[in-house]
Regions:
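Active-site activation/catalytic loop segments of kinase-like enzymes and analogous catalytic loops
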Residues: 242-272, 284-323
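A conserved alpha-helical element in kinase catalytic cores
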Residues: 57-99, 120-135
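ATP-binding glycine-rich phosphate-binding loop
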Residues: 27-52
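Juxta-kinase regulatory segment immediately upstream of eukaryotic protein kinase catalytic domains
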Residues: 1-35
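Conserved kinase catalytic-core helix
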Residues: 116-155
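Active-site Asp-x-Gly
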Residues: 70, 210-211, 223-265
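Conserved short submotifs of the Hanks-type protein kinase catalytic core
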Residues: 103-116
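Active-site catalytic-loop/activation-segment of kinase and kinase-like phosphoryl-transfer enzymes
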Residues: 11, 15, 150-201, 324
Length: 336
């Protein structure tokens, strides 16, 4: 069993018998082996299942969270999205075998996409994954999409820099550099007007829009040949493809992969990007990580803040290059 992470995930032995029996009923076969899966950032119950009939499946579930947990389950939304978006998210999403809710558990049964494939991010892997991601967006760009999906979810990223300046919490961002906080604050003072102007444009981005996954990272995707398989769909929405790819690109870099500029170039081998929409998206994304990186750890989610600080560093370094800003040398002092 491969364990990566510190989230307190339940063992298969902790899954109630009634839940296991219903899994067998939905999948038409009892489970012969359940391998607990780590790798994501939430403590959801996740298992790769081998069935007695030789088939495989993936089990994902929310369950009654322990007292004091900061986890907010969204498995019910993900369930709904797998059902209503099935024709739009294939072949990228795993096949959906069924779901049920009982005893405080909400279970999704999906195609098993196998073990983690990234990181490491080689240039060849990153290019194949990125081109497939572009094909996903291209498949729905400009199409009529379900009305129940948000068209404004990306707007939530349009005001973080402004709010940090207004509340004075921008000092908390600079303090991430510890002894270099004065240098960090000077840099932030220089770039803040640029970031605020660009992030304001995010809510004004015009169509054409596409179906967005809105949370594409290596821990919720697998690369199978030239196809990027993407799971975890609770945040699916409609918006500019540029937002999805900007968030994805800096995440690749944060995990030791190629620089975002290369990722965007590979994406544009399949689908053109609008420079102004990338600019607005990148400003909004950097603001989000600036707002989150200094905050306390979330109970039950022990690795989230660390990964957000890594993404703050990769996204701000990219923004400095893209917007012709001074080099943020202070980022070297920011601990993961």
């Amino acid at each position: 069993m491969s364990r990566q992470g510190a989230e307190p995930k339940p063992a298969w032995s902790a899954v109630p018998r009634e839940i296991k029996d219903e899994v067998a009923r939905v999948l038409r076969s009892p489970v012969s082996r359940a391998e607990r899966v780590y790798g994501g950032y939430a403590p959801s119950a996740t298992f790769r299942l081998r069935l007695t009939n030789g088939r495989r499946a993936f089990f994902k579930a929310s369950y009654p969270a322990p007292k004091g947990s900061g986890v907010k389950w969204v498995v019910d939304v993900e369930d709904r999205n797998y059902r209503r978006l099935a024709s739009l998210i294939a072949p990228w999403a795993p096949r959906f075998f069924g779901s049920f809710a009982r005893l405080g558990w909400h279970v999704l049964l999906l195609e098993d996409l196998g073990p983690r494939t990234m990181p490491p991010w080689s240039p060849a892997k990153a290019r194949r994954a990125t081109r497939s991601y572009a094909e996903f967006h291209k498949s729905t760009l400009g199409r009529a999409l379900p009305r129940g999906l948000s068209r404004t979810q990306h707007h939530d990223f349009a005001g973080f820099w402004g709010e940090l300046a207004k509340t004075g919490e921008i000092e908390r961002v600079a303090s991430l550099a510890h002894r270099g906080k004065d240098e960090a604050r000077e840099w932030i003072d220089v770039v803040l007007p640029v970031m605020r102007q660009l992030e304001d444009a995010l809510a004004k981005t015009k169509p054409p829009f596409a179906l967005l996954h809105f949370d594409t990272r290596s821990d919720n995707s697998r690369l199978q040949g030239g196809l990027l398989r993407i799971f975890d769909w609770p945040f699916a929405s409609v918006g500019p493809a540029e937002f999805d790819v900007a968030a994805y690109a800096q995440g690749v870099t944060a995990e030791g992969g190629p620089e975002p500029e290369r990722v965007l170039a590979w994406y544009e081998e399949v689908l053109s990007l609008r420079a102004d929409a990338i600019d607005a998206s990148l400003a909004g994304i950097t603001g989000y990580f600036a707002d989150r990186s200094w905050k306390p750890e979330i109970p039950g989610l022990p690795r989230v803040r660390s990964f957000q600080r890594r993404q703050l560093k990769s996204s701000l370094a990219w923004a400095a290059r893209r917007f012709d800003l001074p080099e943020p040398r202070w980022l070297a002092a920011v601990a993961d």
